[in-house]
C-alpha cells in the first residue's frame, strides 16, 4: 500500500516517540463513574506524558525472533513480571491464563513502553491477549472515551475479539461495541456515539458508519490504540477504500498493534515505514505442521466427492471422531454441501459469507458448543477463530496456496492433542498442489489407508440428495448470489486496475 507524501493515508504507525518513561504508579480500575466525553473533543489525542514526543532521541526499532537466546534470557516469565496492573494479573489467573505465551512475554512489555508492535505468531498462540492486555492496562488508568479501535477481516473474528475484550475487561466495567455487518447499523451508530471504551469492527462496517454520519469520526479523535488483527488480511486490497476512511478519522499520535499468523510483503513494508519506536516479534518459524497431526490424502473420482465425504462422516462414531471441519473453496459449494447433508440426515452447519450474519454466528456457536459435530466452511474459519477441539479436518477442495493448507489443518492437533487431516485429490491440478504443499511442510502426506470398499453402498441415496440439494440451491436464489458476488469482485478488480494505472 502506498504512502503518498504528506497525507500518508496508510501510515499506520505514529511519529517516533520517546522511550523515556515516568515512574510506574499502580492504579486501580476507575470503573463506572467516568464523565461523558465532551460532544466535540479536541483533535489532539489525550496521551500520557510518557508517550508524548520529546526532544530526546527516539527509541530504536527492535526486531526479535522466538529463537533469539540472548533476548529470551531477559524475557519475563509471569504476567506479574510483564508490568501489568495487578487487577489484570488477577483476571488472567481467573481465566486460567497462568503463564504468558511467547508472543505475550515479548510483546506486552514493549507495548507498555509505548512502542508500535508487529507480532507474528501462529493461530492459538495468545495474540489477542498480547494486544488486549496493554490496552486494558491503559484503560484502567484513564477510562475515557474510545481508547481503542480493533479491526478484523471477518465478522466472526470481530465478534470473537469483542467477547475476549469483555471477558478480560469485566472488572473494569468495559464497554465494548462490535460493529459488524449483518446487524442493525442504526443501533451500532448510536452505540458508537455513546463512546464505548473499545470498538471492534470489520473495516467495511465502520467505514460505512463514518460515511453515513461524518460526525461519528469525532468519536475517534482521542483514540490511543489501533489494532489490526490478522493484519495481512485486513490490509488486503479489498479493504483499501474503507481503510482510507478509517485512518483519516484517527489521530496521528497513537500506538498501532499489528498481529497476524502470516508475515506478508505489506507487513514488512509497514515495518520499514514505522522506523523508530517499533517492535517486531516473530514466533512463526516458517510454514510447518505439528508432529501430532496425521496428514493423509485420498484419490477421489471427480463425480464421487459427495459420496466419499458422506462415507467418511458416517464413520465418525466408529473412528471415535467427535468433530469435523470440512473446508471448501467457494461459498456455493459450502451451501450446497449443507443442503446435501441435510437431505442425508447428517447434522451439520455451514459458515460462509453468503449466509446472514445471525445464522453465521449461530452456526459457529452450535459447532463450538458441540451441539453439531460437522462444520462446513470456506477459509473464513481457517484463521483466528478460537475453536478448541477438532478431531478431523477434511479438505474437500485442496487450497490454492500451501499457507492456506497450513491454516486449515492447524484447526486440529492443537495444544499437544492428536489430529487427522484428509485431503481429497481429484484432478491433476490437485496433484500439483499436493506436491507444493509437501515441499512447503517438508514431509510427504500419506495415502488414506482406511477401508473404502463400502463407499458405494449409499450411492443411490447420495445421488438423490445431490439432485435435491441442487434444486434447493436454485429455488433459494443461491446461484444469483454467486453471480452477484462475481460481478462485485470484477468491479473491485477494475477499480484496482485503474488505481494502479
UniProtKB/Swiss-Prot annotation:
- Limits of the Helicase C-terminal domain: 292-456
Residues covered by region (Disordered): 1-68, 473-501
Q: Which InterPro entries match?
A: DEAD/DEAH_box_helicase_dom, DEAD_box_RNA_helicase, Helicase_ATP-bd, Helicase_C-like, P-loop_NTPase, RNA-helicase_DEAD-box_CS, RNA_helicase_DEAD_Q_motif
Q: Name one GO molecular function term.
A: RNA helicase activity
Q: Does the keyword Nucleotide-binding apply?
A: yes
In terms of superkingdom, the source organism counts as Eukaryota
Keywords recorded for this protein, A-Z: ATP-binding, Coiled coil, Helicase, Hydrolase, Nucleotide-binding, RNA-binding
User: Motif Q motif located where?
Assistant: 77-105
Catalytic reactions on record = ATP + H2O = ADP + phosphate + H(+)
Q: Where along the sequence does the record place the motif called DEAD box?
A: 229-232
Q: Where does ATP bind?
A: 121-128
Keyword Hydrolase appears in the UniProt entry:
yes
Locations of Basic and acidic residues compositional bias?
Answer: 473-486
Q: Spans of biased composition, class Pro residues? A: 36-46
The EC number on file is: 3.6.4.13
Database matches in PANTHER family: ATP-DEPENDENT RNA HELICASE, ATP-DEPENDENT RNA HELICASE RHLE-RELATED
Q: Which family does it belong to?
A: Belongs to the DEAD box helicase family. DDX49/DBP8 subfamily.
Q: What is this protein identified as?
A: DEAD-box ATP-dependent RNA helicase 36
Amino acid at each position: 500500500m502506498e504512502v503518498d507524501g504528506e497525507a500518508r493515508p496508510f501510515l499506520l504507525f505514529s511519529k517516533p516517540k520517546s522511550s523515556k518513561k515516568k515512574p510506574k504508579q499502580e492504579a486501580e480500575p476507575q470503573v463506572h463513574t467516568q464523565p461523558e466525553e465532551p460532544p466535540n473533543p479536541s483533535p489532539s489525542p489525550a496521551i500520557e506524558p510518557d508517550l508524548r514526543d520529546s526532544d530526546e532521541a527516539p527509541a530504536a526499532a527492535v526486531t526479535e525472533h522466538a529463537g533469539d537466546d540472548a533476548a529470551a534470557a531477559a524475557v519475563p516469565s509471569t504476567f506479574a513480571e510483564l508490568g501489568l496492573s495487578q487487577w489484570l494479573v488477577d483476571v488472567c489467573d481467573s481465566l486460567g491464563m497462568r503463564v504468558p505465551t511467547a508472543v505475550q512475554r515479548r510483546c506486552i512489555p514493549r507495548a507498555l513502553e509505548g512502542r508500535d508492535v508487529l507480532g507474528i505468531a501462529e493461530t492459538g498462540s495468545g495474540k489477542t491477549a498480547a494486544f488486549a492486555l496493554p490496552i486494558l492496562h491503559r484503560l484502567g488508568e484513564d477510562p475515557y472515551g474510545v481508547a481503542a479501535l480493533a479491526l478484523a477481516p471477518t465478522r466472526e473474528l470481530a465478534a470473537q475479539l469483542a467477547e475476549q475484550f469483555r471477558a478480560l475487561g469485566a472488572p473494569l466495567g468495559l464497554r465494548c461495541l462490535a460493529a459488524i455487518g449483518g446487524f442493525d447499523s442504526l443501533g451500532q451508530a448510536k452505540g458508537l456515539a455513546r463512546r464505548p471504551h473499545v470498538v471492534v469492527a470489520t473495516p467495511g462496517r465502520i467505514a460505512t458508519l463514518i460515511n453515513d454520519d461524518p460526525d461519528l469520526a469525532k468519536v475517534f479523535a482521542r483514540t490511543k490504540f489501533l489494532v489490526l488483527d490478522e493484519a495481512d488480511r485486513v490490509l488486503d486490497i479489498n479493504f483499501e477504500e474503507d481503510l482510507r476512511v478509517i485512518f483519516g478519522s484517527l489521530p496521528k499520535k497513537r500506538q498501532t498493534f499489528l498481529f497476524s499468523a502470516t508475515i506478508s510483503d505489506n507487513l514488512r513494508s509497514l515495518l520499514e515505514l514505522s522506523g523508530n519506536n517499533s517492535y517486531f516479534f516473530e514466533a512463526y518459524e516458517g510454514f510447518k505442521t505439528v508432529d501430532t497431526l496425521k496428514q493423509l490424502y485420498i484419490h477421489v473420482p471427480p463425480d464421487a466427492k459427495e459420496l466419499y465425504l458422506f462415507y467418511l462422516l458416517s464413520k465418525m462414531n466408529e473412528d471415535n471422531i467427535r468433530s469435523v471441519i470440512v473446508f471448501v473453496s467457494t461459498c456455493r459449494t459450502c451451501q450446497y454441501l449443507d443442503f446435501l447433508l441435510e437431505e442425508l440426515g447428517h447434522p451439520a452447519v455451514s459458515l460462509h459469507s453468503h449466509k446472514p450474519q445471525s445464522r453465521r454466528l449461530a452456526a459457529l456457536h452450535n459447532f463450538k458448543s458441540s451441539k453439531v459435530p460437522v462444520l462446513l466452511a470456506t477459509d473464513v474459519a481457517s484463521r483466528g477463530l478460537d475453536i478448541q477441539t477438532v478431531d478431523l479436518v477434511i479438505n474437500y477442495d485442496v487450497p490454492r496456496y500451501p499457507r492456506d493448507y497450513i491454516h486449515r489443518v492447524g484447526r486440529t492437533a492443537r495444544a499437544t492433542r492428536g489430529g487427522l487431516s484428509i485431503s481429497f485429490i481429484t484432478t491433476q491440478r490437485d496433484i500439483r498442489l499436493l506436491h507444493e504443499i509437501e515441499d512447503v511442510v517438508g514431509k510427504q502426506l500419506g495415502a488414506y489407508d482406511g477401508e473404502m470398499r463400502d463407499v458405494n453402498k449409499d450411492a443411490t441415496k447420495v445421488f438423490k440428495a445431490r439432485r435435491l440439494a441442487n434444486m434447493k440451491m436454485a429455488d433459494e436464489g443461491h446461484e444469483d448470489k454467486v453471480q452477484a458476488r462475481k460481478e462485485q469482485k470484477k468491479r473491485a478488480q477494475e477499480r484496482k486496475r485503474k488505481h494502479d494505472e
